[in-house]
Amino acid sequence: MSPPPSAHTAASTATPLLDLRITRKLYGDRTILADVPLQVARGEIVCVVGPSGCGKSTLLRIVAGLDTDFRGSVKLGGIALDGPSPRAGVIFQEPRLLPWLSIADNVGFAAGPRGGREPSVARLLDEVGLAGVARQLPATLSGGMAQRAAIARGLFGEPDLLLLDEPFSAVDAITRMRLQTLLLDVVERHRTAAIVVTHDLDEALYLGDRVLMLAPNPGRIDDEIHVEVARPRDRRDPTLAVLRARLLDAFQQLQDRADETKRRTLDLQGAEA
């Protein structure tokens, strides 16, 4: 009898929820992203890492429909996107809560009318542990609580895909671990998929079913690591330590290449001056 498929194998063989093909993304005459194919299945978490300037946040903006000026295509649930979609919830590094609205109104306001298909704001706030502060203003919350509110806002409307851009980098270590656990619970409970951009390699290995390494100049998928470690994950698992060493080595190679490219550019500019 064959062994049961791993979580990643099951996700990989399913029809992809997200089918992304970026042929080229330009800023002026500079290519930011090139030849980036990405498929993500429901229930899968994909973490994206890479040196600064490699196009990680730009990739998220394209998937979210916030940047449509690129060559390629984005399909979510088999439907081509040409702008923002209620099926994708975006969570930024900063919570970006409207200061004059209560926490409950912030969660409900961001999504707008959705025909009653969304879960109630009260239920979402209870899910992220903020039921007791629903009527408070954002200024009264800690950074971790504000980010919990942002997660609830991202879930409003029952999106199929969560897009998180450095979501936990502005909070302390204990709060970060709690928010990571919350994200894992949310993805499992709602059967969503998630793409997480992070600079933290340990976070990527802890959260991700896959970790993609974007190379700079231009951004391409340079490496892909399948994290075949079952959840709940022990951060001390020796398998994660091996993968971390591989990621660190790949990251350092990419950083060295980026530094060398920058040095050559400066040399050329100096020669032309």
From Swiss-Prot:
CDD domains: ABC_NrtD_SsuB_transporters
Record membrane topology: Peripheral membrane protein
Pfam families reported in the protein's UniProt record: ABC_tran (PF00005)
InterPro entries on file: AAA+_ATPase (IPR003593), ABC_transporter-like_ATP-bd (IPR003439), ABC_transporter-like_CS (IPR017871), ABC_transporter_ATP-bind (IPR050166), P-loop_NTPase (IPR027417)
Family matches, as Gene3D superfamilies: P-loop containing nucleotide triphosphate hydrolases
Localization terms from the record: Cell inner membrane
Catalytic activity: ATP + H2O + aliphatic sulfonate-[sulfonate-binding protein]Side 1 = ADP + phosphate + aliphatic sulfonateSide 2 + [sulfonate-binding protein]Side 1
Statement: the UniProt record of this protein carries the keyword Phosphoprotein: no
Main location (coarse class): membrane
Official protein name in the record: Aliphatic sulfonates import ATP-binding protein SsuB 2
Gene: ssuB2
